[in-house]
């Protein structure tokens, strides 16, 4: 005798909801909220880097330079670059023998 014939399989009635008041509006609302929460949680986990980067830095890439003369813009760029160069010099190279 095969093992497959001795395994009990659930009947169609076994999968049905046993709640007598499943048509209650509160149960339906809770189910919808639960499904929406699950969908939002999955989207959050998939795109959390993009979402929180937008919140942290906003849509702009930097301060607005509208109405600022070109010479001041160039000076600002040089200051930013020198600040980056200083940060690069902060690291120490250690050589092991």
From Swiss-Prot:
Q: Under the cellular component aspect of Gene Ontology, which terms does the record hold?
A: host cell plasma membrane; membrane; virion membrane
Q: Which residues lie on this side of the membrane: Virion surface?
A: 1-22
Q: Tell me where in this chain the PTM Phosphoserine is found.
A: 64, 82
Question: Positions of the site: Seems to be involved in pH gating?
Answer: 41
Residue ranges annotated as Intravirion topological domain: 44-97
Q: Where is this site: Essential for channel activity, possibly by being protonated during channel activation, and by forming the channel gate and the selective filter?
A: 37
MF-aspect GO terms: monoatomic ion channel activity; proton transmembrane transporter activity
Query: What is the recorded membrane topology of this protein?
Result: Single-pass type III membrane protein
**Coarse class of the protein's main subcellular location:** virion
Query: By its UniProt entry, which Pfam families does this protein fall under?
Result: Flu_M2
Q: Where in the cell is it found?
A: Virion membrane; Host apical cell membrane
Give the UniProt keywords, A-Z. Disulfide bond, Host cell membrane, Host membrane, Host-virus interaction, Hydrogen ion transport, Inhibition of host autophagy by virus, Ion channel, Ion transport, Lipoprotein, Membrane, Palmitate, Phosphoprotein, Signal-anchor, Transmembrane, Transmembrane helix, Transport, Viral ion channel, Virion
UniProt superkingdom: Viruses
Q: Where is the lipid attached (S-palmitoyl cysteine)?
A: 50
Q: What is the activity-regulation note?
A: The M2 protein from most influenza A strains is inhibited by amantadine and rimantadine, resulting in viral uncoating incapacity. Emergence of amantadine-resistant variants is usually rapid.
GO biological process terms held by the UniProt record: protein complex oligomerization; symbiont genome entry into host cell via pore formation in plasma membrane; symbiont-mediated suppression of host autophagy
**Segments passing through the bilayer:** 23-43
Q: Where is this region: Disordered?
A: 60-83
The cross-references to HAMAP family, in alphabetical order and at most eight, read:
INFV_M2 (MF_04069)
Miscellaneous remark of the record: When the channel is activated, one or more imidazole moieties of His-37 probably become bi-protonated.
Oligomeric and partner information:
Homotetramer; composed of two disulfide-linked dimers held together by non-covalent interactions. May interact with matrix protein 1.
> What does the function comment of this entry state?
Forms a proton-selective ion channel that is necessary for the efficient release of the viral genome during virus entry. After attaching to the cell surface, the virion enters the cell by endocytosis. Acidification of the endosome triggers M2 ion channel activity.
Q: What is known of its domains?
A: Cytoplasmic tail plays an important role in virion assembly and morphogenesis.
Recorded family membership: Belongs to the influenza viruses matrix protein M2 family.
What name has this protein been given in UniProt? Matrix protein 2
């Amino acid at each position: 005798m095969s093992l497959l014939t001795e395994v009990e399989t659930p009947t169609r009635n076994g999968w049905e909801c046993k709640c007598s008041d499943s048509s209650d509006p509160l149960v339906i609302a809770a189910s919808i909220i639960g499904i929406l929460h699950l969908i939002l949680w999955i989207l959050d986990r998939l795109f959390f880097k993009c979402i929180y980067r937008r919140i942290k830095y906003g849509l702009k890439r930097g301060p607005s330079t509208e109405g600022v003369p070109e010479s001041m813009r160039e000076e600002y760029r040089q200051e930013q670059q020198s600040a980056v160069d200083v940060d690069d010099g902060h690291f120490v190279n250690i050589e092991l023998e």
